[in-house]
């Protein structure tokens, strides 16, 4: 197969391949960029594989950086752009089910491609557009099939994360996992415990944000992979309930983790514990803790000014997107109008602050000041008093007399 017109992203890198070839070596675009070119999907970055050893690449190009030279990776700097090239290699001795104990540089493209995960990712592309397909990856692309290169058990023992990549690709590409490959995942699922949770999280997030999350989730459940993920060990019923939902339009991590929080029926404290097991960022945890109650309020049509104020515009949007998945959402425009009606959108918009309380009302810094500002804020949000400095100071006088 020959691609007549390569996507524009390849053009600046073509002279790099040509220069390597002129020096007597082979060089190809490889991996996901080739797959996505054939599928007419967006290409995010390009990978180059070559028969030239790192020392030979450094001899060909004047400007290089050793980004992973022990694994054969050298970055070529060309006209201000960096291109990572990796020498053809074989790998052996995967004691941690993730990284090889030994890497051997080779001159054979075939040896390099046969260590890759799936046939659709084991394609190579010449700079002139000729596709090299040694493992029937083109046929599997046509069949929309995710199939391990060679023996699935060997591929998953080399890198157990490949099992999560398989179910993620099922969602991302809306493909089906090959029978033998699926069987291999079921048999090797316990190996997922050997993988760092951060890496598993990335794959799960991509799965739930993919083109067909239901397809990926179905395989995630059927293979038993979920049993080796933090907090999901006994979640088959909760996860399976997601398979009947068809309005999947999740946009970001906050939304997808909120869905899982809802499915697992987690309270605020449990949400924090669950997400910490997945080693998510603290700001994501805070966002999910806002989104989940807002989804429940949307479902019950109980969105109050206080809840909208505390949730904030971004989390409200996220909550309504999650609610759409369940068929609970309210009209986006209606939600936006309700939010915009709030007299203030954050505490900084209050007409007085701590300094005014000190100078005009004689309130000293401390817990009382915080309590007063909170009461004033909620009173303004709920339309009980106007956001006016004079009115607010009168209210302060009332509060201090009561207190």
Curated annotation (Swiss-Prot):
Cofactor dependence: Mg(2+)
Task: Tell me which EC number(s) this protein carries.
Answer: 2.7.7.72
Q: Which Gene3D superfamilies match?
A: 1.10.110.30, 1.10.246.80, 1.20.58.560, Beta Polymerase, domain 2
Top-level taxon: Bacteria
Family annotation (CDD domains): NT_ClassII-CCAase
| Reaction(s) catalysed (UniProt annotation) | a tRNA precursor + 2 CTP + ATP = a tRNA with a 3' CCA end + 3 diphosphate; a tRNA with a 3' CCA end + 2 CTP + ATP = a tRNA with a 3' CCACCA end + 3 diphosphate
| The entry's keywords | ATP-binding, Magnesium, Metal-binding, Nucleotide-binding, Nucleotidyltransferase, RNA repair, RNA-binding, Transferase, tRNA processing
Q: Does the keyword RNA-binding apply?
A: yes
Broad enzyme group? transferase
What GO MF terms are annotated? ATP binding; CCA tRNA nucleotidyltransferase activity; magnesium ion binding; tRNA binding
In which family does this protein belong, per the annotation?
Answer: Belongs to the tRNA nucleotidyltransferase/poly(A) polymerase family. Bacterial CCA-adding enzyme type 3 subfamily.
Annotated function: Catalyzes the addition and repair of the essential 3'-terminal CCA sequence in tRNAs without using a nucleic acid template. Adds these three nucleotides in the order of C, C, and A to the tRNA nucleotide-73, using CTP and ATP as substrates and producing inorganic pyrophosphate. tRNA 3'-terminal CCA addition is required both for tRNA processing and repair. Also involved in tRNA surveillance by mediating tandem CCA addition to generate a CCACCA at the 3' terminus of unstable tRNAs. While stable tRNAs receive only 3'-terminal CCA, unstable tRNAs are marked with CCACCA and rapidly degraded.
On subunit structure and binding partners, the annotation says: Homodimer.
State the name under which the record lists this protein. CCA-adding enzyme
Q: Give the source species.
A: Limosilactobacillus reuteri (strain DSM 20016) (Lactobacillus reuteri)
